[in-house]
Amino acid sequence: MASSHAYSLFVLFLLLICSCSEALLRGHPVDPTCPRERPSSVVATVSSRHGGEAWCQPPAPHTPVAVLPYDVEPMQFALNLEYTEAEFFLHGAFGVGLDQIAPNLALGGPPPVGARKADLDEVTWRVIAEFGLQEVGHIRAIQRTVGGIPRPLIDLSAHNFGRVMDTAFGYHLDPPFDPYTSSLDFLLASYVIPYLGINGYVGTNPIIDGYETKKLLAGLLGVEAAQDAVLRGLLFERLGAAVPPYGNITVAEFTDRVSAMRNRLGRCGVKDEGITVPRGLGAERAICTNVLSADGDSLSYARTPAELLRILYLTGDEHLPGGFFPEGANGRIARSFLGKTHQ
């Protein structure tokens, strides 16, 4: 009986080693709550009603060039935001970042400063974990299509996020804001970053023409917009709730202050709104709900690289680094504002 029990423990130990080894080889954390995999109807082969292969190829592109030379730099600039989102979400969910999950994608850039695992509830953890892993795919897709740039030095410390919120409110919050202390704090911090990616992709779309580049941007924009919508939706569910320990300051006020800060730093008018607005700014000027930030025709706002850098640097000046990029963002576009060579 004892030998049988020992044998069972030995087999269990071997299975554990194998599963852990497989996870390490892939580099990705494993979700232990996923059900046992079985054949899925989602991936079943689809045939035409005539019994042959269904025609699934898109029509031929009007522009016969996959990636045009002038497509490269705007798409590489986007990697600055993708790196930032990836590191923030991965560390928040798993306590590790690209250097542990996909080290080849960092292209030799320095690790982020101050990022750490957040104290998240189950639902928020699942959302953030998925977003983080999605960002890994985004970085890989951009690098595969237009080439990469090294990950810049990214400041994701509680101190930096505290400065962001102090800048948004115009005074020092007491205690300083820390995104890693709770699910709500992490969601509010997440409100700061992904929306800018949407603005950037909308602004980039008119200036690229290669069919592969256009396809890449559309795919990125779709998922980035969905991520922002989920984050805003989760915050909207709590819009009237006070954010502890800040007395009567509500979730809605936090989003309004952050959006106003981004407009102020961007210096190009209103391109950002919180989760509630005056009815005159709502969809068709008929509603004060603002789960999705959009213009008068309910279209996404566009921002230029210069606008984005003014906001991300927290300086209002694309020539003066700081904020999330203390040494400046990377790529030829960002470095040109600093009078430096391409990196």
Placement of each model-derived feature along the sequence:
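All-alpha RGS (Regulator of G-protein Signaling) helical domain and cognate RGS-like helical scaffolds
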Residues: 22-343
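Cleavable N-terminal signal peptides of Sec/SRP-targeted secreted and luminal proteins
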Residues: 5-23, 45-48
